[in-house]
Curated annotation (Swiss-Prot):
Domain of life: Bacteria
Protein's job: Transaldolase is important for the balance of metabolites in the pentose-phosphate pathway.
Biological process according to GO: carbohydrate metabolic process; pentose-phosphate shunt
Annotated EC: 2.2.1.2
Cellular component, GO annotation: cytoplasm
Locations listed in the record: Cytoplasm
Family statement: Belongs to the transaldolase family. Type 3B subfamily.
Catalytic residue list: 83
InterPro entries: Aldolase_TIM (IPR013785), TAL/FSA (IPR001585), Transaldolase_3B (IPR022999), Transaldolase_3B/F6P_aldolase (IPR004731), Transaldolase_AS (IPR018225), TSA/FSA_arc/bac (IPR033919)
Classification via Pfam families: TAL_FSA
Protein name listed in UniProt: Probable transaldolase
Coiled-coil ranges per UniProt: none
Keyword GTP-binding in annotation: no
Length: 215
């Protein structure tokens, strides 16, 4: 499973990109607003750091507006992916944008049916939301498995991005369920790095080294 980082914070992106573990970035209006900077400015800076898919989301709710905004987002950089909400108007926009060769990421997916519709409309990516499904007691990983199964049976090339990830367990469960990509918040990526036994092991190695050579 490939890993993206889910943030609009440039410093977080730089830090994680330097580790060599991510190959893309997802943003949304909330994440960009949190940075208090111009959308285009933030996105352009991100494209200069990560050479991979960068999702930027439309604000419009009607198909015409989404298409217009999507075309503008696509012009920013060759790696841009237009993030579209899973609605009737969103599907119309995806159909048009995909026909123009513009990559799309249909977001706010909460059912296998929604994922199938988005894929058939031409979506490059679909983003089922794990954390929000967990909040209502739904089986989020079961949803990933269902979408993977449907796409495999019918040879659908749309990639599945596990989104709304809140813990390292979400990441591992998504990978085991067959998601192509997990888009992971900075905090969770950092949590994935650490393990108490790793720290203990390093301390023991250093102690043994000092005892052997620094007598």
């Amino acid at each position: 499973m490939k890993l993206f980082i889910d943030t609009a914070n440039v410093e977080e992106i730089k830090e994680v990109n330097d580790m060599g573990v991510i190959c893309g970035v997802t943003t949304n209006p909330s994440l960009v607003a949190k940075e208090g900077r111009d959308f285009n400015e933030v996105i352009r800076e991100i494209t200069s750091i990560v050479d991979g898919p960068i999702s930027g989301e439309v604000i419009a709710l009607d198909a015409e507006g989404m298409i217009k905004e999507g075309r503008e987002i696509a012009k920013i950089h060759k790696n841009m992916v237009v993030k579209i909400p899973m609605t009737e108007e969103g599907l119309k926009a995806v159909k048009v944008l995909s026909s123009e060769g513009i990559k799309t990421n249909v977001t706010l997916i909460f059912s296998a049916g929604q994922a199938l519709l988005a894929a058939r409309a031409g979506a490059t990516f679909v983003s089922p939301f794990l954390g929000r499904l967990d909040d209502i007691g739904a089986d989020s990983i079961g949803l990933i498995e269902s979408i993977v199964n449907i796409f495999d049976i019918h040879d659908i090339r749309t990639e599945i991005i596990a989104a709304s990830i809140r813990s390292p367990k979400h990441v591992i469960d998504s990978a085991e369920a067959g998601a192509h990509i997990g888009t992971v918040p900075y905090k969770v990526l950092k949590q994935l790095i650490k393990h108490p036994l790793t720290d203990i092991g390093i301390e023991r190695f250093m102690k043994d080294w000092k005892e052997a050579f620094n007598k």
